[in-house]
Amino acid sequence: MRKAHELAIGERAVIIDVDNSHPSSHRILEIGFTPGQEIELLNYSLFKDPLAFAIRGTIIAIRKEEANCIQI
């Protein structure tokens, strides 16, 4: 399995799971990064932190550390 921060710009994937042991996992789930949702990496800043994802018809930027707990 890959992590969301490993996507290339323009690449899409479906979320398989969110690592519940990660401190930010509750926040990630609350903002819509839930299993079964399709995400697309739109852009990122220097060093891939933060990353901008398209999900559920909106754009959400999260830190690389948070994207690391999203399994695709």
State where each predicted segment sits.
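Compact, glycine-rich, soluble single-domain proteins
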Residues: 1-72
